[in-house]
Amino acid sequence: AIEEISEGDWRVIFAANVDAAFFLAQAAAPAMKQAGYGRIVTISSGAGLRPSLTGIQAYASAKHALVGLTKQLAWEFGPHGITVNSVAPGFVRSNPASERQWQSYGPEGQKRLVESIHTRRLGTPDDIANATLFFLSEQAGWISGQVLSVDGGRS
């Protein structure tokens, strides 16, 4: 519930998800602009496009903000030959937090989640890496300001 989120928790989540992307892009911008070329890919989330499965307001809000930052940077950097896009993963068991979330669902909740995904499987880190590599490639040279949902068709 929103009443349970401390200001500190809110700020930590925004720092990790929005501030980090902003300051990394800011640091890379001069060299990319001088080169007239660059690729920036942010990792947002399905929670940046719709309500979060976690119910954590700060996480969903930060991921929505990251999508907005991605689109704004694409607008600003485009004239300099720099593309900016975002990969929005669905549920991937890739770290202790996602593993705890998965375990909290229990067998029935896990089954419901997998059945809500059109491909009937959870994503893998490789699924996310492949989408990211696409945005970094020349094949995506005329794509900017876009968010690619990598969620097995759940969105």
Predicted segments — roles?
Residues G78, T83, I143-G145:
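Short, small/polar-rich loop/turn modules that mediate ligand/substrate recognition or access, typified
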Residues A1-I2, D9-R11, W102, G109, ...:
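Substrate-binding pocket helix/loop in short-chain dehydrogenase/reductase
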Residues A25, A62, T70:
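Active-site helix of classical SDR
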Residues R50, L133, S144-S155:
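Short C-terminal tail/terminal secondary-structure segment
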Residues P30, W75-E76, G141:
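Alpha-helical segment proximal to the catalytic Tyr-Lys
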Residues S45:
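Residue(s) in the substrate-gating loop at a strand-loop-helix junction
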Residues L49, A88-R100:
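Short, flexible catalytic-loop segment of classical short-chain dehydrogenase/reductase
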